[in-house]
């Protein structure tokens, strides 16, 4: 039997607005520090069919819960991401950032970026604590609605999947 551990680390998001002339109107750094760990066990099995070794979500789509998704709405670009709840007020480079490594205990945030000024506003949307953990980088936008999948792997035989809708105004 072989065990492989893969650690995915996602850092800051760099944002800028470039005018048609090529001049930079503004530049911002959104501090972010995410760490997601994937543990895979390989070996022989005496069973067949759907089981612990079979996955609905491909590991090539990893990391599932870190990273971010973005969508434009009105004069804002909205960034969705899971983060450590202690980072609720972090919007500027240089601020202390706590690592979001216990992803199942993270909060899902929407960070709005004003397209004209680059000003950042962070709002907590929900906690991932008691629900399947949000997967922001896999979100889909239809009109003003953002659909996001959540996934929980606490027990290999009792995985939970949820789909949530967020309506942008």
Language model: regions and residue ranges:
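Secretory-pathway ectodomains
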Residues: 1-169
